[in-house]
């Protein structure tokens, strides 16, 4: 991502261009944008940590799920989400990747999408699927 995009994102209260795009999509569906409104406290081995999901999406049954946008999906992010899943198995965290086919690292055969499937995470490419927004 260019520094210009990042600068524009910060000016609008977000950290990336993808977050701006997802916020606009949520708003266009008539859903109030809740960006980084929640913190989930979890234990990183040997230390207490917290995670702030990007977006909180309400569901029609009164529940909600979180959407985490990812351009790069680094090893530390993957480890954090595995810890969160283990410590909060009923918390619904879903990913929207800027490129779900991106490999985890140079030379890897595993894409972001494959990693999500292996570990039981719901994911999408580029935008939030309409089905998610209509739950």
Report each predicted region and the residues it spans.
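Nucleic-acid endo/exonuclease domains
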Residues: 1-135
């Amino acid at each position: 991502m260019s520094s210009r995009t990042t600068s524009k994102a910060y000016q609008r209260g977000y950290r990336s261009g993808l977050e701006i795009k997802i916020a606009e999509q949520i708003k266009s569906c008539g859903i109030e944008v809740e960006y980084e409104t929640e913190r989930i406290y979890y234990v990183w081995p040997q230390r207490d940590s917290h995670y702030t999901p990007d977006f909180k999406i309400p569901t029609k049954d009164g529940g909600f799920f979180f959407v985490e946008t990812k351009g790069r999906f680094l090893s530390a992010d993957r480890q954090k989400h595995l810890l969160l899943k283990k410590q909060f198995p009923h918390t619904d965290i879903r990913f929207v990747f800027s490129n779900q086919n991106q490999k985890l690292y140079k030379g890897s055969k595993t894409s972001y999408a494959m990693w999500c499937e292996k570990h039981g995470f719901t994911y999408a490419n580029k935008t939030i699927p309409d089905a998610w927004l209509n739950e």
